[in-house]
Regions:
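ADP-ribose/NAD+-binding catalytic cleft of ART/PARP-like enzymes
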Residues: 1-38, 55
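Short, flexible beta-strand-to-coil junctions
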Residues: 6-12, 45, 61, 68-75
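Active-site-adjacent loop/helix micro-motif of nuclease/hydrolase catalytic cores
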Residues: 16, 51, 77-79
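Active-site and NAD+-binding cores of ADP-ribose-processing enzymes
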Residues: 26, 62-141
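Short active-site loop/helix that positions an aromatic residue
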Residues: 46-61
């Protein structure tokens, strides 16, 4: 099973240097029923699925680096769920997110995995990609 995580340069640097990353955040206390995760959150899937998920994750996660990996022992990771905007439903209705009042966009629960601490010893990295989002150049002249 492949998992993915969008992360900052700083987080990636620590991970690649062999540090154990620790996050004790109980997301259910911060987001109520919108999340059952504790610690770091990971999406399920490969690079293609991660890039598709980016649409719902933008503004929530740091997108400096995309890491796709195979857990060495999936039992160390806890299944959880997070509630996000359901862009597939919006697209199927022929609408865009701006057609809904703020806070009333269609949402659904997505399966994820979480863990409170991990290091390179816990994962086999398959993909590390930087600059996931396109760079826009605006010419004001």
């Amino acid at each position: 099973m492949k998992l993915y995580r969008f992360m900052s340069y700083a987080e990636c640097d620590k991970l690649l240097k062999g540090e154990t990353l620790v996050n004790s955040t109980d997301h259910s206390k911060k987001r109520g029923t919108a999340s059952s995760a504790k610690g770091f959150c990971f999406g399920i899937g490969d690079e293609k699925q991660a890039k598709k998920a980016l649409r719902r994750l933008r503004g929530i996660v740091s997108t400096d680096i995309l890491m796709v990996f195979e857990p060495k022992d999936i039992s160390k990771f806890t299944p959880c769920q997070g509630r996000y905007v359901d862009y597939e439903k919006i697209d199927s209705e022929g609408k865009c997110v701006d057609d809904y009042p703020i806070g009333w966009e269609p949402c659904r629960m997505f399966d994820e995995y979480c863990i409170s601490s991990y290091s390179r010893d816990d994962i086999d990295i398959e993909v590390l990609e930087k600059d996931i989002l396109p760079t826009f150049i605006v010419d004001f002249q």
